[in-house]
Amino acid sequence: MKTPCDTPAVLLADKLHFQYLEPALFTNFSVRVMPGVTLVCGGSGRGKSTLLRLLAGVQPLSAGQLHIHGICLQDEPEAYRQQVLWTEPRSTVFDELTALQYFELQRRTYGGFTTSHLAGLIKGLNLEPHVNKPLYMLSTGSKRKVWLAAAFASSAAVTLIDEPFAALDTDSTGFALQLLEDAATHGARAWVIAHFEQPGKVALAGRIDLGD
């Protein structure tokens, strides 16, 4: 039986440096992201969202390296990004697509996308009345449900979610918590979520505390 020490990390961040103001937000920042759920916490302005963008490979690093299952962002950027699911919560890039069209786009992007699982996610997140609407017509909470449904169906090696419960109704928050509780104990996927506290009873594989 494998012990936690034997389990290989899914994502390795080595000596990351990022700066857009003085002082640098991240200096020689290294972390091993294991399978399961890792929490990124910290006060406002400490860089939680920025760290997710850096790990996703969409925010350029000043220095350092990122690897997912041995694939280096700097050497193979396209292959690296195909291992990561990240959607900017406030993104308008997909606004002209319906929710179903967005899911189809994600299915083509991620080879392990589980269409059979998607129907249950749509139902559990109360998205059924909205799947044929263009995303620009959806409320902030409903758009976040679309991002969450795609995330849980994607089978991406690394899934990054910024404030997963923001603007969700009570039932959908409970459903998302159940999904994260299951993700924490099953499978080889790594989930990195930015949130101000440990979500519910989700067992954490790691915690990245950026301070107050």
Enumerate the predicted regions with their spans.
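A short, flexible loop at the N-terminus of ABC-type nucleotide-binding domains that lies
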Residues: M1-S30, M34-P35, P77
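Helix-to-loop junction immediately C-terminal to a conserved catalytic motif
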Residues: A56
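Conserved ABC transporter NBD signature motif
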Residues: G64-D75, A79-Y80
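Q-loop/switch helix immediately C-terminal to the Walker
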Residues: R90, D95-G111
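Conserved ABC ATPase "signature" region
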Residues: T115-V131
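ABC-family nucleotide-binding domains
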Residues: D162, L168-D169
